[in-house]
Amino acid sequence: MTTGADADLIERGRKLFAGDWQFIWASPSIETLPPMAGVEVAFAGRSNVGKSSLINALTGRGTLARTSRTPGRTQELIFFEGPKDADVRLVDMPGYGFASAPKARIASWTSLIHKFLLGRASLARVYVLIDSRHGIKDIDQAILTTLDRSAVSYQIVLTKADEVKATEMAERTEATRTLLAKHPAAFPDVLVTSSRTGYGVPELRAAMARLIGEHQR
């Protein structure tokens, strides 16, 4: 049952993402990051977990974030800026866990991710995307540990829910909640989404609207 407060947050989230969102910056290195401004929310996850697709679903713009079938294609921190009165940025982080890229490039991308997480005061939260079909892998655990150690708030978003049976999805969600209890920087609520069907997208928008509102007070 949706309460009045829930409905209000969902409407706030809808309005936030109904505004004009646009690409503003691409950073291949920590030295080329844009100046910190407003509230930043980042999306992290394994290669092809659906980060770009979810950003497109959130904003309702199918081509805002470029998607690729090639793992590891996103090699930079990609910044998108929302409506001017919102003072919010989304950050599409390089996918991790790709096996086909050269080791030197993997090391470079990994270093960029870690340095960004450790030194970005404007970063309100990292949404760590997990493929619902596979659950949390060792490489995801390593990122969660990095976030814990750097005291960066993060929340798990399970993606591609349309490709998993309902019973399996419920089990995966509960197993994820249980695992997160061991991680001090993790927000306890697990969000379940499908960029293809739109399932869970209004709830993610609402969660982000609440978070952004708290940081702008």
Curated annotation (Swiss-Prot):
CC per GO annotation: cytosol
| Positions with a binding annotation for GTP | 45-52, 72-76, 92-95, 159-162, 193-195
Q: Which GO terms describe its molecular function?
A: GTP binding; metal ion binding
Xref: SUPFAM superfamilies: P-loop containing nucleoside triphosphate hydrolases
Give start and end of each EngB-type G domain. Answer: 37-214
Q: Which GO terms describe its biological process?
A: division septum assembly
Any Pfam family matching the protein: MMR_HSR1
Tell me which residues bind Mg(2+). S52, T74
Q: Which domain of life is it from?
A: Bacteria
* Assigned keywords, A-Z: Cell cycle, Cell division, GTP-binding, Magnesium, Metal-binding, Nucleotide-binding, Septation
Required cofactor(s)? Mg(2+)
Known role: Necessary for normal cell division and for the maintenance of normal septation.
Instruction: Spell out the NCBIfam families in the cross-references.
Output: GTPase_YsxC (TIGR03598)
Record-stated family: Belongs to the TRAFAC class TrmE-Era-EngA-EngB-Septin-like GTPase superfamily. EngB GTPase family.
Question: What is the protein's given name?
Answer: Probable GTP-binding protein EngB
Print the organism lineage: Bacteria, Pseudomonadati, Pseudomonadota, Alphaproteobacteria, Hyphomicrobiales
